[in-house]
Structure formats: C-alpha cells, structure tokens
Amino acid sequence: MVAAAAALSLFSGCGGDTLGMSQTGLDVKWYSELVSTFQESHDMNFKHSTLLGGDIRKIPDEKFEELRGKVDTIFAGFPCQSFSHGGKKDPDDPRGQLFHQFVRATRLIQPKFIIGENVKGLLTRKTQNGGLFLDLILEEFRTIGYTCHYKVFSADAAGVPQSRERLILVGSKEPMADPFPSLRGSPKKVLRDVLRFDMAGAIKVDRELLTEAGVPEEHILVGEGEPIGTPHPYLQLKVSERDVTYNGKRVSTYAFSFGKRKSPVHCEVVDPRICSKTLICTYDHQPRLFVAQKTPEGYYLRPYTIDEIKEIQGFPRDYKLSGNLKQQIVQLGNAVPPPLIREVCAWIHR
C-alpha cells in the first residue's frame, strides 16, 4: 500500500483546510495555529496531526528544515484582516506581513506544491509604497524558485451553500499547465439543504413584518414548539424598530427584507432557494441574517444555529469545536470552506 502524501497546514484555525486536504487523501501530519481554542478544535478532529508551534514567527528554522523531503504540500490560509473589505485595511498591520512566514516555511521545507488562501480584496490591496501586496507575494515566492498562479473562486461552486469569494494561490517548482479546476461539475447546494426548524433563540414577530419584507409563505419553515433561550439582543433591537430611515429618508416600516438587504441598516430574512451571504466571524456579535419560521402560535425569526453555520461553511454537523458559542462562530467565520480546498487539492494531485 502506497503511503499518503504528507502535508503541513499553516495558520490552521479550527481545521477547515486540514479537513479539505484529508478528504483528498493527503495526510496532514503537522500544523501551526496561534489561538489555543482553535488548536483544541483542530486536535479534537485530527488527533494524528502534530502542532509544530503556536506563534509561527517563533518556530525555529531548524524545525521546518527537519521536514525537508517529508512534505508534499504546504497550505497557508494566512491572516486576511489587512486585505478584507470587511476588516481594517491598515498596510502596516503586522497580520498582513505573515505571508513572509509562509515563504520562510516553503524555502526551508521545499515542498512539491504550495497552496495559499486569502480574501478577494488581496487583488487590490496596496503596500505603503503603492505596489500591490499580491505582486510582492508572488515575487517573494519566485525568488525562492516557486512559480505561482492565482484565481478567485466562490465557495458555492464547490458545493458550499454560501456566496464566499476566496483567492486561491497555487505554486510549484515544476511548470503547471492547468493549475485550477473548473468546479463546474460540483453539486449545487442552497440554504434549503441545510436549514432545519429550530426554536433556539427565536423571537415572535408580526406577520406584517414578514409581509413587508416580501417573505413568501412557502419559504417559511414550519414546525411546533416554544422559543428556547433568550433571543439575540441585536435581533430584539431590530424587531422593535419602526419607520426605518437611511440617508435621512424613510425606507420602510420594519428593518427586514427578504433575500437581500434593502439598505445597509436592514437585516435579511434568508431565502432558502439560494446560497447564504458570506458569513463572517462577527455573526455572533451582530447577526444580519435570519431564518423565518411558523408554528400554530405565530411567526418567528431566529439566527442560524451553530450546526447550520457549520454546513453553510462546508463542515459536517458532527465536526467538533472547542469553546463557547461565540468562540465557535469566530472559528467557523475565519475558516476556509473544506470543499473548496478539497477540489483544489484533488485537481493539483490528479
């Protein structure tokens, strides 16, 4: 039996890329991750994978050099807050410089393939000198002998029920004529495939709210039961709003619209026929996406459940996560969708 090719995951988070690589037969023997809660989640799901270190900047060269000749693929979902349209765009943010550690590990280990993942915003983000960050990254890899290609994918093309655009970078020392899959054959998933009737965090609303939002009766989840727990404070606030204004103009009576946000101050009642909007790590703090439900007692709205968030990000429902609900949502919001990495890895190892 041929041994599985070994891989190293850098900036692993809770293990989205590790799961994706594992699904293609790669053996992710080593990983690095700074946050202890994320490490715990990774360890619970991949007990055979060894933590190289927490702060990648403190992993000595010698530790990486020991892996030379042993690693087929290095994956790095290096931090994206400096490049994200939703994050702070500070060119001096040290998190935006961590790609240097990806380059260092590659130089010392000399893998066959490298895969990087980041937000689409990296395409346009500039350095303090006015050049593109992406050009700087490509040049640093070119200097150590790796030719890189990049492409933007939407995770829904890989069968993830979420519109989540990510920049994927693939590099190797040998020429790659066709480095990226088309993903056109992946089965399509929408929210209807992952949403389940659940009264956790539900709050009762007037049918008039859903009517104004444009929610069709047939797209409301139906079941029985009483609300469980306390509704999210932000949901309570938005449900109580009346006569919503934006830019000094009244735009609606209620602060909700169906399938899209009517204005930046609106929340969205999700349309189960389509994919979710991008889920970010602040969803627990200020959720803007809600599920409509109905019982014999009336109509309700609730946030996504943690199991739904897992599936919306491409994780199985039984994926283990450490920490409280907020910490779990942060982990998932920061994760790379495993099916996207599975498809890319399967293609380059075909």
Model-derived features with residue positions:
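Core alpha/beta nucleotide-donor-binding catalytic domains of modification enzymes
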Residues: 2-113, 119-134, 142
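Conserved S-adenosyl-L-methionine
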Residues: 146-157
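S-adenosyl-L-methionine-dependent DNA methyltransferase catalytic core
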Residues: 1-28, 140, 166-350
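Short beta-strands and strand-loop turn motifs
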Residues: 115-120, 151, 322
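A short helix->loop->beta-strand "cap" motif at the edges of active sites that frequently abuts
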Residues: 110-112, 146, 165
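Short, surface-exposed amphipathic charged segments that create phosphate/polyanion-binding patches used
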Residues: 66-68, 163-170
